[in-house]
Design a protein with these regions (language model features):
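Solvent-exposed, polar/charged alpha-helical surfaces in well-ordered, non-transmembrane soluble domains
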Residues: 16, 41, 45, 59, ...
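Secondary-structure end/capping motifs
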Residues: 190-272
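Solvent-exposed, acidic/flexible segments
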Residues: 7, 32, 36, 76, ...
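Short, glycine-/small- and polar/acidic-enriched structural segments
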Residues: 1-122, 128-130, 146-150, 174
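Ligand-binding clefts/hinges and TM-proximal coupling segments of bilobed small-molecule sensing domains
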Residues: 27, 106-126, 200-236, 280-283, ...
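Conserved C-terminal helix/tail region of periplasmic/extracytoplasmic solute-binding proteins
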Residues: 261-296
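Pocket-lining segment of extracytoplasmic ligand-binding domains
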Residues: 57, 129, 135-224
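Proline/Glycine/Serine-rich low-complexity intrinsically disordered segments
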Residues: 88-93, 117, 125, 137, ...
Length: 296
């Protein structure tokens, strides 16, 4: 079973599980992608069974008719997504007329819109520079942009070089959520493998809590950060365990469905969704029930 993610500290427990040997003997293949755009494309054509996406990207695919459901909440951003500015930009309002680099994703558009509205600005008040996330650091260092809508690990790298935080996901709490989604065909054929993937991720989280130094040392090279940088990045998010996932996903109208409904409405109003998708099959909560039963 193929599982695709971009490089994002909130997905790193999946790779930590592999590094700890928890995938040995299991038919699981992690596919490392350059961006969530690639993950979305792979889900569209069926070349991935499972992927890590933000909730807004999930809504975009559901709107397109891609047959996926959320099976797990990986992380909830609480500062790890941000708008950073160069030292000569004193505040958000000073971004008027400036160049802002942003990845061409629903999340990038959503974060940019939220930051601009917070500053009383509109998109036409700034120069938007489309910029894949793997070019964020180089564009910053060459002065090609005055500000960036970015996330870890680039966020942490840039903060270490003197970037200033103008706006981050703490100002829109609970709205930037990363989830594991599965194609419904995979849910039919491979539910046991999805359960194994989630169980190994939870074991990796337990290792992170019990032996943080070892876990951070293992995670740092893949992310291109120091262990201290990984710890700082993790401080900007919540990593829900099995019990938390049951609270978020299970039952009638669970919290994640409510968040998705609010996010869908905001995306529709901002023109990011031409129409509002049916959320009837947004969540498959079977794994949340199973994992919560196993949570100590």
């Amino acid at each position: 079973m193929s599982i695709g993610t971009n490089t994002w500290v909130g997905y790193e427990p999946l790779y930590l599980a592999r590094d700890l040997g928890l995938h040995e003997g299991l038919a699981l293949r992690l596919v490392e992608l350059g961006s969530t755009t690639q993950a979305m494309d792979a889900l569209r054509v069926g070349s991935l069974d499972v992927a890590g996406l933000t909730l807004d990207e999930t809504l975009t695919l559901l709107h397109e008719g891609v047959p996926i459901s959320v099976v797990w909440v990986m992380n909830i951003s609480a500062g790890a997504d941000a708008v950073l500015a160069q030292a000569d930009v004193p505040d958000l309002a000073s971004l008027r007329g400036r160049r802002i680099g942003v990845e061409q994703t629903a999340l990038g558009a959503y974060m940019l819109d939220a930051a601009l509205r917070h500053a009383g600005l509109k998109a036409e008040d700034v120069t938007i520079v489309p910029l894949p996330v793997d070019e964020h650091v180089s564009a910053w260092s060459t002065g090609a942009v005055d500000a960036l809508v970015t996330f870890d690990p680039p966020r942490q790298m840039l903060l270490d070089t003197g970037a200033r935080t103008m706006f981050d996901s703490r100002q829109i709490p609970g709205q930037i959520v990363d989830v594991l989604v599965a194609r419904r065909a995979a849910l039919q054929c491979c539910a046991a493998r999805i359960a194994q993937l989630i169980a190994s991720q939870q074991q990796a989280l337990a290792h992170l809590q019990a032996q943080p130094q070892d876990a951070l040392q293992r995670m740092a090279p893949r992310l291109g950060l120091s262990p201290e940088g990984v710890a700082a990045a993790l401080a900007g998010m919540e990593l829900p365990d099995g019990a938390a996932n049951q609270r978020l996903l299970a039952g009638a109208n669970p919290p994640l469905a409510q968040t998705a409904g609010q996010l869908m409405q905001a995306m529709w109003q901002q023109g990011l969704l031409p129409r509002q998708p049916d959320l009837g099959q947004l969540i498959d909560d079977r794994f949340a029930h199973t994992s919560a039963e196993q949570t100590p």
